[in-house]
Regions:
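Stable alpha-helical elements in mature extracytoplasmic
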Residues: 59, 64-71, 80, 84, ...
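Active-site-adjacent structural segments surrounding the nucleophilic cysteine of cysteine proteases
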Residues: 11-94, 139-142, 155-157, 208-213
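Short, exposed beta-strand "edge-strand" segments with a Pro/Gly-rich flavor and a Y/T-containing core
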Residues: 73-79, 91-99, 111-118, 174-182
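Active-site-adjacent substructure of cysteine-protease-like catalytic cores
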Residues: 112-170
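N-terminal Lys/Arg-rich, disordered targeting/topogenic segments
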Residues: 1-8
C-alpha cells in the first residue's frame, strides 16, 4: 500500500476511535454509566408482580415519565405520566429523556435507584424481588427508536411488560399488571440497543428501592 494511502487509512481509524471515545464520555455525562452486574443468583422460574395498578397510554415521547409514574403507583403514590413529563429533567431536544432523568425524579420522590448492565438472569432476579424494573429497549428490533418500559414478570417463554405505547399492547391481565408479553428471544433483540454512539447501553435497566429509615 502506498504511504499516502496508508497514512490516510490511519487518519480515518484514529478519527473514528476518537469519535467513539468522545461519544462515550458525553453519554457517560448525560446518561450515567451503567454498573455491570453478571453474578448469577437464584430466582423463581416464573414470577409476576400481582399488584393492581393502572397502565396509561402515552401520546408522544413520554415513555420515561409513564414508566416512572407506573413505578410510583406501584409504591402507592398517585402519579400521572403526562403531568410528570411536563417538568421531567434531562430531556433531549427531541423530547426523549436520558436514563438519568428517571433516576433524578425517583430520587426526588425518596427512592433509591441503580442503573445496571446485566443479562436475562440478573433482570429476572431483580423482577423477582417484587418491584417493576424499567428496561431500556428498542421499540422495534429492526429500528433504532428507543423506549423505556417496566418489566413486571417473566416465565420460561415470555417477559411481561406494562406497555405505554398503544400499538405494542397485545394482551391484558386482570390485575392490570401487564398488557404486553414478549417472547424471550425477541426481548433479547429489543434489549440490544448498542450502536456506534452507544456501545455500553445494551441490556441495561433501572431498579428502584425504598430507602430504609
Amino acid at each position: 500500500m502506498p504511504k499516502a494511502m496508508e497514512g490516510s487509512s490511519m487518519f480515518i481509524v484514529r478519527t473514528a476511535i476518537l469519535g467513539i471515545i468522545i461519544s462515550t464520555i458525553i453519554n457517560a455525562y448525560l446518561m450515567t454509566l451503567p454498573l455491570p452486574v453478571l453474578r448469577k443468583r437464584d430466582y423463581m422460574a416464573n414470577y409476576l408482580i400481582k399488584r393492581n395498578n393502572r397502565i396509561d397510554i402515552q401520546n408522544k415521547r413520554e415513555c420515561a415519565a409513564f414508566s416512572t409514574a407506573y413505578v410510583l403507583r406501584h409504591f402507592g403514590m398517585e402519579a400521572d405520566g403526562e403531568e410528570l413529563y411536563t417538568n421531567f429533567p434531562n430531556k433531549m431536544s427531541s423530547g426523549n429523556v436520558y436514563p438519568k432523568g428517571i433516576r433524578r425524579v425517583l430520587r426526588k420522590k425518596g427512592f433509591k435507584t441503580n442503573y445496571y448492565k446485566g443479562n436475562l438472569n440478573t433482570l429476572k432476579y431483580e423482577v423477582s424481588k417484587g418491584t417493576p424494573v424499567i428496561v431500556f429497549i428498542k421499540v422495534h428490533k429492526d429500528r433504532n427508536n428507543l423506549h423505556f418500559v417496566p418489566v413486571v414478570g417473566y416465565d420460561k417463554e415470555y417477559f411481561y411488560l406494562s406497555e405505554s405505547l398503544r400499538h405494542l399492547v397485545n394482551c391484558n391481565d386482570d390485575n392490570n399488571s401487564y398488557n404486553r408479553k414478549v417472547p424471550i428471544n425477541e426481548f433479547k433483540e429489543l434489549w440490544n440497543v448498542k450502536n456506534i454512539n452507544m456501545l455500553l447501553y445494551s441490556n441495561t435497566y433501572i431498579t428502584v428501592h425504598t430507602i430504609q429509615s
